[in-house]
């Protein structure tokens, strides 16, 4: 409601403008509303970012979709309220600006009082009309002050009226269901009672997963698949997946058994290979005895245990009871080739030592047979090469003639 500021003298309008609290409170209110708007907008953006991160990557499922649908209205309310708070701050800023403009246009009260004092003084001394022109000029100035104050007040009133036009604030709607806790308890009880038949809900779960996967590319199809999944889950399907998994468990157990048998077979193969390698011990013992005969007093005591142990190992001492026995190493050998026992091994050529030279007096001797039976090409340990290295001539020492000899 506008007042008729033109009917009020400038003393009243100027006094009102200069006696008020000023625009300081308006500027403080505008800053406060602007801060409220920024906080609401930040909260809305944070909500939106967190929900997008949860429902898009980390949290998938019907609960995620329902949570997003429930919290979306609240995020929209935050955004709308932030815009309204920003509008309020803008309007208050406009009102403060209008006040400062009106204050600048208003005539200061001391100037009005000085004008009135001069007029009264001139009227008091105007005996012969000599002050009439001066009084008229002061009255004209006073009328201009009146008009100026009235204009300032009208402009300020219009600005304040526009600033008071605001959109009403609304409260956020309730985004929770009061019947949620009882429904959750009932659902938990039903799931516990039907835990044995949970395998029949695979089709409903599949439909719900399809609906969730379609959310980024076709959100309009998501509600259809979610509702279809809930309907299918409500149907009491028989438990058919359990039998299939029992069959798979049996196949896996059979595969594990076959693997164990293969491991046992590999172990037996390793033992047989070790037995074959141990069969060479008697030949090594015989070759060692032939290459370097030990003294007669210790030869039987030393070689008998070694030969007996090698013989027992090579004849199958490692075989367990109840196994199939087989004879090994019955064939003869010529070089690296196995031959029938009737074949005769070629005679081993004897390598003689170097013949004695006229420069030596030690006679030569026959060298022992080279090689180990069963391992051709392997030199026997201690195969001697008897004889002394021949000497060809004697190095002579020549002495020079001493100086004292003359």
Curated annotation (Swiss-Prot):
Disulfide bonds: none annotated. InterPro entries: PPE_C, PPE_dom, PPE_sf. Transmembrane segments: none annotated. Signal peptide: none annotated. It comes from the Bacteria. GO terms for biological process: response to host immune response. Belongs to the mycobacterial PPE family. This is Uncharacterized PPE family protein PPE61. It comes from Mycobacterium tuberculosis (strain CDC 1551 / Oshkosh). The lineage of its organism: Bacteria, Bacillati, Actinomycetota, Actinomycetes, Mycobacteriales. The gene is PPE61.
């Amino acid at each position: 409601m506008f007042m008729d500021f033109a009917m009020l003298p400038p003393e009243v309008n100027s006094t009102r403008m200069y006696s008020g609290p000023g625009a300081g409170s308006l500027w403080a209110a505008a800053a406060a509303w602007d801060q409220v708007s920024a906080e609401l907008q930040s909260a809305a953006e944070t909500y939106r970012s967190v929900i997008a991160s949860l429902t898009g990557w980390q949290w998938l499922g019907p609960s995620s979709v329902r949570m997003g649908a429930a919290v979306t209205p609240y995020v929209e309310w935050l955004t709308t309220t932030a815009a309204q708070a920003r509008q309020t701050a803008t309007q208050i800023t406009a009102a403060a600006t209008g006040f400062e403009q009106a204050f600048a246009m208003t005539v200061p009260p001391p100037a009005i009082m000085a004008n009135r004092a001069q007029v009264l003084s001139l009227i008091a001394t105007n005996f012969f009309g000599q002050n009439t022109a001066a009084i008229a000029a002061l009255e004209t100035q006073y009328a201009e002050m009146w008009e100026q104050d009235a204009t300032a007040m009208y402009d300020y009133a219009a600005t304040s009226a526009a600033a008071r036009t605001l959109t009403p604030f609304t409260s956020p709607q309730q985004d929770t269901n009061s019947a949620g806790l009882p429904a959750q308890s009932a659902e938990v009880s039903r799931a516990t009672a039907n835990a044995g038949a949970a395998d029949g809900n695979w089709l409903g779960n599949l439909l719900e997963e399809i609906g969730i996967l379609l959310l980024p590319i076709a959100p309009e199809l998501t509600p259809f698949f979610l509702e279809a999944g809930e309907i299918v889950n409500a149907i009491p399907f028989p438990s058919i997946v359990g039998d299939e998994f029992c069959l798979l468990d049996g196949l896996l157990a059979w595969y594990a058994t076959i693997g164990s048998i293969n491991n046992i077979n590999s172990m037996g193969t390793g033992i047989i290979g070790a037995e074959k390698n141990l069969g060479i011990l008697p030949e090594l013992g015989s070759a060692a005895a032939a290459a370097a005969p030990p003294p007669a007093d210790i030869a039987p005591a030393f070689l008998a245990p070694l030969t007996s142990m090698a013989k027992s190992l090579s004849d199958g001492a490692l075989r367990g009871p109840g196994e199939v026995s087989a004879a090994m190493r019955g064939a003869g050998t010529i070089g690296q080739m196995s031959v029938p026992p009737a074949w005769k091994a070629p005679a081993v050529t004897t390598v003689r030592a170097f013949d004695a030279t006229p420069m030596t007096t030690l006679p030569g001797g026959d060298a022992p047979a080279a090689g180990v039976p069963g391992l051709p090409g392997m030199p026997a340990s201690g195969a001697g090469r008897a004889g002394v290295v021949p000497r060809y001539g004697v190095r002579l020492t020549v002495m020079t003639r001493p100086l004292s000899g003359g």
